[in-house]
Design a protein with these regions (language model features):
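Short beta-strand-loop/turn "lid" adjacent to the catalytic site in phosphate-handling enzymes
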Residues: 77-114, 134-136, 169-181, 185-190, ...
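N-terminal glycine/serine-rich phosphate-binding loop of ATP-dependent small-molecule kinases
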Residues: 1-111, 125, 157, 218, ...
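Carbohydrate-associated surface elements
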Residues: 117
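Generic structural signal for well-ordered secondary structure
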Residues: 54, 58, 62-65, 92, ...
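Active-site donor-binding loop signature of nucleotide-sugar glycosyltransferases
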Residues: 43-45, 226, 503
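Conserved beta-strand positions that form and line the central face of beta-propeller blades
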Residues: 42, 114, 500
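Active-site core segments that coordinate phosphate-bearing ligands/cofactors
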Residues: 2-11, 17-18, 122-138, 142-178, ...
Length: 533
């Protein structure tokens, strides 16, 4: 019965398709009118390091897009015994930031420089000072400025600068459009006008005036759109590009292309003010939707927006679970010496759960998980450390808790700026990533660390491709005047509240004691970085 209803949805054009180009996987998700996943496709790819630059070739983009669409159409055929020839709405998402420039004929002028490149230090610093706004190295404007400062030959021929998602959208629809969340990773956004900041554009034009370029910055930037806007439709050329078999028909309406941060917010239902999400895996970051812009610039905090234009503060830290994983590896080796084999997922669960038995302040134990530097605490490089006082209580529970607290400590520094200096209030945070895999543990400790309820949902794993499919669905299915936040609450997540854990007062007090020692011990970390090579 359900299969027949889904067939009707597909044939009746009630579906929405989202494709996200992630760093290692291009993923497609098809949803029905209830925003439930009904088919999926994908393609694995990798970036390349060429001439010192992390890049992807654009022909690989189209190989991946076609294969992603082909496998999704095959999934539809296998499950529902019909050919996919159209969908009700569509959207493209991708890795944010980076540098993609084209001339008047649409020819690529320079290798695609991805978000991963940290080669724009001078430009990022000088632009941050010029604008009075934090410009991270990965932003498009920092890459453009570097190319100009370096006198790269192609700059005089630039007609259009965009992102990966913006490029794919342009090729499929012919429209030089971009979603506001994605745009906020190219150049600063004015939260009143929901467009690129005109004052900062003029400052940039003045900065490069002596180069006598034949264009002004505004001329080469895409048009900014908010969630819910119509941003073009699939052209005949676009349909053939995506589906060379010719079965896919043109005319499908497109929502604005968005960045992976924005689609992640949508997929975790954290686009409303006073909400946010924490992603905790190899690195850790929090994105908080603000009620108003911050009062000043903080180098530790990046400012972006939600897909509907609300200001978002992002605290990003380089280190999270790598050090924890190395300790688990040591414990695994120990267990193997005694019993010969070990169930690794069970070992992780046991370690995590043991942490809940530890003293609230970890009994005086202290850990630094710095495999690499942390700008939040002022370290350009890192040395993983574990230390304790002679009278500290060294047992497994305290040790496990200290290691888990260390995965969250640097995030707390950035979050303190928001809560203590800017008085930002957060009603709930949605947790996702490996740190939250063991039920209830990472969530309980994170709630204590950030002194905010933390929710974990089963859908958090669906990811950005589902998020961009939901944005396409929002454009197609929203009621007049219905906000994105309201649409997600009522038509997507509904009663799906997830498992919410409130901060425990004793845990929170224990973490404060841990943090006092952590701050004092940063001098040990500094000595290690300066002297251990």
């Amino acid at each position: 019965m359900k299969t027949e209803k889904i067939r009707e949805s597909i044939l009746g054009g009630k579906t929405s398709l989202g494709i996200e180009l992630g760093s290692t996987r291009i993923k497609g998700i098809l949803v029905d009118e209830n925003n439930e996943v009904i088919a999926a496709g994908g393609y694995s790819w990798e970036n390349k390091l060429e001439n010192g630059i992390w890049t992807y070739h654009l022909n690989d983009v189209w190989t991946g897009m076609r294969e992603c669409y082909r496998t999704l159409a095959e999934d539809v055929r296998g499950k529902y015994d019909i050919e996919l020839t159209s969908v009700g709405a569509m959207g493209i998402s991708g890795m944010m930031h980076g540098y993609l420039v084209f001339d008047k004929e649409g020819r690529q002028l320079a290798d695609f420089r991805t978000w991963r490149n940290t080669v724009t230090e001078r430009s990022a610093a000088e632009l941050s000072e010029l604008f009075g706004f934090n410009i991270p190295q990965r932003w498009s404007i920092a890459h453009l400025d570097r190319a100009i400062l370096n006198g790269e030959d192609h700059i005089k021929n630039i007609d259009f600068m965009t992102t990966l998602a913006g490029y794919v959208h342009w090729m499929l629809t012919g429209e030089k459009a971009i979603g506001i969340g994605e745009a906020s990773g190219m150049f600063p956004i004015n939260s009143e006008t929901h467009d690129f900041d005109e004052t900062m554009i003029k400052k940039f034009d003045s900065r490069v005036a002596d180069k006598n370029l034949p264009w002004k910055l505004r001329d080469i930037l895409p048009t900014v759109h908010s969630a819910g806007d119509f941003a073009g439709k699939l052209t005949e050329e676009g349909a053939k590009l995506l589906d060379p078999t010719g079965k896919l028909k043109p005319g499908i309406p497109f929502c604005p292309p968005e960045g992976d941060a924005g689609t992640g917010m949508v997929a975790t239902n954290s686009v409303g003010q006073r909400t946010g999400n924490v992603s905790a895996g190899t690195s850790i970051f929090a994105m908080i939707v603000l009620e108003k812009p911050l009062s000043k610039v903080y180098p530790e905090i990046d400012m972006v927006t939600t897909p509907d234009g609300s200001p978002v503060a992002m605290v990003h830290c380089n280190n999270c679970t790598t050090d924890l994983d190395s300790w688990i590896g040591l414990l695994k080796e120990t267990v193997e010496l005694m019993s010969g084999s070990v169930d690794v997922p069970k070992l992780y669960d046991t370690f995590y759960n043991k942490a809940l038995e530890g003293a609230p302040d970890c009994g005086g134990l202290l850990s630094y998980n710095y495999y690499s530097g942390e700008h939040t605490t002022g370290f350009e490089a890192g040395r993983p450390l574990f230390t304790k006082l002679p009278d500290s209580k060294m047992n497994l529970a305290n040790f496990a808790r200290a290691i888990l607290f260390s995965t969250m400590a640097t995030l707390k520094f950035g979050m303190n700026i928001l809560t203590e200096k800017e008085f930002v209030r957060v009603d709930r945070l949605l947790g996702h990533g490996g740190l939250f895999k063991t039920p209830g543990v990472g969530q309980k400790l994170m709630a204590a660390v950030l002194e905010t309820p933390v929710v974990v949902m089963s859908t958090a794993g669906e990811g950005g491709a589902w998020g961009i499919a939901l944005l396409a669905s929002y454009m197609k299915n929203r009621a007049d005047g219905e906000s994105l936040d309201s649409f997600l609450d009522s038509k997507v997540f509904g009663d799906m509240l997830g498992d919410s854990v409130a901060p425990d007062a004793e845990d929170a007090e224990g973490f404060k004691k841990y943090m006092n020692r952590y701050r004092a011990g940063l001098a040990i970390e500094r000595a290690a970085v300066d002297n251990l090579n």
